Swiss-Prot record:
NCBIfam families named among the record's database cross-references: trpD
Functional pathway: Amino-acid biosynthesis; L-tryptophan biosynthesis; L-tryptophan from chorismate: step 2/5
EC code: 2.4.2.18
Gene name per UniProt: trpD2
Record-linked HAMAP family: TrpD (MF_00211)
Catalytic activity: N-(5-phospho-beta-D-ribosyl)anthranilate + diphosphate = 5-phospho-alpha-D-ribose 1-diphosphate + anthranilate
Annotated Mg(2+) 1 binding sites: 82, 216
Protein name according to UniProt: Anthranilate phosphoribosyltransferase 2
Quaternary structure, from the entry: Homodimer.
Principal EC category: transferase
Taxonomy, superkingdom: Bacteria
GO molecular function, one term: magnesium ion binding
Binding, anthranilate 1: 70, 101
GO biological process assignments: L-tryptophan biosynthetic process
């Protein structure tokens, strides 16, 4: 590759891959070339736009949907912070379409922990839309909505290393959600990932990387953060300690397997105190700011805490788990 690919060229290459017309060797070579050169906003936007052409859309979704996610790859093996934050945000009235998969770089991905919590993860498009209508939150399992990505599975497995493909998942929410919180594994990715989200039609977003390496807003360290709001981008140094949150220590936010992480989420949603609660409230506050529900970080933290302490978040998780197993043609979730 003598020069960086343009957005159109990256999109064309991705279409060849998604159609199953590229060999495993070609897919691996392409992924490595883009990754080694450094995935640019042009590369990522082109690849994500092309991948979305092959996705199964979510009916009746609407553009006011929120997704909360991290790209993974920070190597810290924390519990599922963005998943917990999504539940709290939904309990505050934000419509959430959580796009995710099983674990790629830790012991437990969003799909794994939700499955452990009783949520059915493999809903089809109509079922996912019905669940969203009933509860205000739904899960979009990447293999169901992006079947064409199966062509990349073999080469990615053989490479055994993170590549540009690992950055695409958070960019390719099949609901068209225009509200995003997105954590990335390096500071250098914050600006390009924000630019890509804007090119893909996202109207409001917070994209961040914490100084301790976390692809979430961490309570252990400040974060480099870019806010996208209706076409304007502003850069901040965000320190949670300035908003009254205690500094967490290494290990305070550690996760484990799906059973361990599910227990952490249930404990937080039940009102348990400590570092896990603080980091969930922080990331939920970010989601509430993006959604326009909270005008300030303090408001976001207060609303998130109220949803947890008043039982709304735990109650929503129970309703979500129940609704996810109902037929799409049922008008209401049976009592």
């Amino acid at each position: 590759m003598q020069r960086p690919l343009t957005e159109a060229e990256a999109a064309d290459a991705m279409r060849v891959i998604m159609r199953g017309e590229a060999t495993a060797a070609q897919i691996a070579a392409f992924a490595l070339a883009v990754t080694v050169r450094g995935a640019s906003a042009d590369n990522l936007a082109g690849m994500a736009r092309a991948a979305q052409e092959f996705a199964t859309p979510v009916p009746r979704a609407g553009g006011d949907l929120l997704d909360t996610c991290g790209t993974g790859g920070d190597g810290l093996n924390t519990f599922n912070i963005s998943t917990a934050a999504a539940i709290v945000a939904a309990a505050c009235g934000v419509r959430v379409a959580k796009h995710g998969n099983r674990s790629a770089s830790s012991a437990c991905g969003s799909a794994d922990v939700l499955e452990e919590l009783g949520v059915r993860i493999d809903l089809g498009a109509e079922e996912a839309a019905a669940c969203l209508d009933r509860t205000g939150i739904t899960f979009l399992f990447a293999p169901v909505f992006h079947p064409a990505f199966r062509h990349t599975a073999g080469p990615r497995r053989e490479l055994g290393a993170r590549t540009v493909f690992n950055l695409l998942g958070p960019l390719c929410n099949p609901s068209g959600a225009r509200l995003r919180t997105l954590g990335v594994p390096s500071r250098e990715l914050v600006e390009p990932m924000t630019e890509v989200l804007e090119r893909l039609g996202v109207t409001r977003a917070l994209v961040f990387h914490s100084a301790d390496g976390m692809d979430e807003l961490s309570t252990a360290a400040p974060a480099h953060l870019v806010e996208l709001r209706d076409g304007r981008r502003t850069t901040h140094r965000f320190d949670p300690a300035e908003h009254g949150l205690a500094r967490s220590r290494p290990g305070d936010l550690a996760g484990g397997d799906r059973a361990v992480n599910a227990a952490v989420l249930r404990r937080v949603l039940a009102g348990g105190r400590g570092p896990a609660r603080d980091v969930v409230l922080l990331n939920a506050a970010a989601a509430l700011r993006v959604a326009g529900v909270a005008g300030t970080w303090s408001d976001g933290l207060r609303l998130a805490a109220s949803a947890v302490d008043g039982g709304a978040a735990a109650g929503l998780l129970d309703r979500w788990a129940h609704a996810s197993w109902q037929r799409a043609d049922l008008v209401e979730v049976p009592a």
